[in-house]
């Protein structure tokens, strides 16, 4: 079962360790089992994170966890499994940095006045995102093609979701 208090404190402790690797800490999950713990850490950066960066972050995090008394107290006297990964395509776009990393990508998002749309992220400035809306879903679930540019506050949209695009071959 996840322990949110322990995970929150571990996130606070690990954020500088991850930042020291040039990465952003995107999530920490601590799953308690009877005889062990499973710690999931999600990291990212602008331009995406590479496998060797994940490996370096994993080593730095492991070293920290093995040598920090507070982290040791949270995890407890049992063994733990450390899993460090990138967020993956299914991560919701919530923070401005998430939207910035999605510039040029197609996303599904819910707008306050239009409802669900599929749009291309064109730009992010501060807490605003400029979208090129390509498809809008109607109340009966039909998908209608439309093009409209719109700038909206990130706080006003429900979390966005990146849409997978496939290349069309002639």
Swiss-Prot record:
Name assigned to this protein: Ribosome maturation factor RimP
The species this protein was found in: Acidothermus cellulolyticus (strain ATCC 43068 / DSM 8971 / 11B)
Keywords: Cytoplasm, Ribosome biogenesis
GO biological process: ribosomal small subunit assembly; translation
Gene3D superfamilies noted in UniProt: RimP-like superfamily, N-terminal
UniProt xrefs under InterPro entries: Ribosome_maturation_RimP (IPR003728), RimP_N (IPR028989), RimP_N_sf (IPR035956)
Localization (cell): Cytoplasm
Keyword Plastid: no
Function statement: Required for maturation of 30S ribosomal subunits.
Entries under HAMAP family matching the protein: RimP
Superkingdom: Bacteria
Family of the protein in this entry: Belongs to the RimP family.
Pfam families: RimP_N
Any one annotated GO CC term: cytosol
